[in-house]
Curated annotation (Swiss-Prot):
Pfam families: Pept_tRNA_hydro. Monomer. Its EC number is 3.1.1.29. Its main location: cytoplasm. This is Peptidyl-tRNA hydrolase. TRNA binds at residues 19, 70, 72, 118. Keywords: Cytoplasm, Hydrolase, RNA-binding, tRNA-binding. It catalyses: an N-acyl-L-alpha-aminoacyl-tRNA + H2O = an N-acyl-L-amino acid + a tRNA + H(+). The lineage of its organism: Bacteria, Bacillati, Cyanobacteriota, Cyanophyceae, Synechococcales. The keyword RNA-binding applies.
Length: 207
């Protein structure tokens, strides 16, 4: 993805108030933060099976999509949006939560496997390729060993961020929103050099 290519940013998540503040919905959170900052609003688009916001105009218009299909069928909405707008894969970026990264870390990649994430699995299935950009947003993993992690995965990703995590989450969302602008202005490689090197930490309140 070169600078100026980005046209569609998709945040992965689950629809409904029940899931609104869960770790699995951090992609939705980032898009809502960006739309709020830019004065945009989401509207229902049944033909895309999602909610859509438009930012900017003309050649600089950026569309934000939150699939309403539930996580495991996200690819259906993404495929519909690409077809409806006539976008190519190099114009797409997917925002996704990642348990393999701690909260405070980001990883921008031009392509890759699903890594066990059902939303990415669905996207790869419906697009027929792994060759699309994705920004993985760390949410941390439950437990210290594989068996504990496996047992607690569902409750972790469908659980809300704790009050202690919220200040760091706020910093992460700000970096993601700023990172989208970096991608537009600099392209994927240069933006990735910055985003992939971040190691955000909560602001200390100690005197």
């Amino acid at each position: 993805m070169n600078r100026g290519d980005l046209r569609l940013v998709v945040g992965l998540g689950n629809p409904g108030n029940r899931y609104a503040n869960t770790r699995h919905n951090v992609g939705f959170m980032a898009l809502e933060r960006l739309a709020s900052r830019e004065g945009g609003g989401f509207r229902s688009m049944p033909k895309l099976q999602g909610q859509l916001a438009d930012l900017g105009s003309g050649d600089k218009r950026l569309r934000l999509l939150m699939p309403q299909t539930f996580m495991n069928d996200s690819g259906r909405s993404i495929r519909a949006a690409l077809d409806w707008f006539g976008f190519e894969l190099h114009q797409l970026l997917v925002l996704v939560d990642d348990m393999d990264l701690p909260l405070g870390r980001l990883r921008l990649r031009a392509r890759g496997s699903a890594g066990g994430h059902n939303g990415l699995k669905s996207t790869i299935q419906h697009l027929g390729t792994q060759d699309f950009a994705r920004l993985r947003i760390g949410i941390g993993a439950p437990g210290q060993n594989p068996s504990e992690r496996k047992a607690r995965t569902v409750s972790h990703v469908l659980g809300s961020f704790s009050r202690d995590e919220e200040p760091l989450l706020d910093k992460v969302l700000l970096e993601v929103v700023d990172g989208l602008e970096r991608i537009q202005l600099q392209g994927l490689d240069l933006a990735g050099n910055h985003l992939n090197g971040l190691q955000l930490a909560p602001t200390s309140t100690e005197e």
